[in-house]
From Swiss-Prot:
UniProt record, GO biological process: translation
Stretch list, region Disordered: 1-22
Taxonomy of the source species: Bacteria, Pseudomonadati, Pseudomonadota, Gammaproteobacteria, Moraxellales
UniProt keyword annotation of Ribosomal protein present: yes
Record-level GO cellular component terms: large ribosomal subunit
Bias (Basic residues): 1-20
InterPro entries: Ribosomal_bL32 (IPR002677), Ribosomal_bL32_bact (IPR044957), Ribosomal_zn-bd (IPR011332)
Keywords for the protein's UniProt record, in alphabetical order: Ribonucleoprotein, Ribosomal protein
Pfam families per UniProt: Ribosomal_L32p
GO terms, molecular function: structural constituent of ribosome
Entry keyword annotation includes Ribonucleoprotein: yes
The protein, known as: Large ribosomal subunit protein bL32
Top-level division of the source organism's lineage: Bacteria
Family indicated by similarity: Belongs to the bacterial ribosomal protein bL32 family.
Protein's organism: Psychrobacter arcticus (strain DSM 17307 / VKM B-2377 / 273-4)
Length: 60
């Protein structure tokens, strides 16, 4: 197994982890319903880019 020669400093550790942050989700507002949804995802009503792709039942 590989064993490090010397301990890494907090600065080096944190610089390595600087890319591990959480990204903020891109939010869009649907033109037809005005509902907020994630980019490139359809809304809960079944609309995507102004067209209804699926008919969603109201049972759920």
């Amino acid at each position: 197994m590989a064993v490090q020669k010397s301990r890494k400093s907090r600065s080096r550790r944190d610089m390595r982890r600087s890319h591990h942050r959480m990204e903020i989700a891109e939010i869009s507002i649907d033109a037809t319903t005005g509902e907020k949804h994630r980019r490139h995802h359809m809304t809960k009503d079944g609309f995507y880019r102004g067209r209804q792709l699926f008919k969603v039942s109201q049972d759920a």
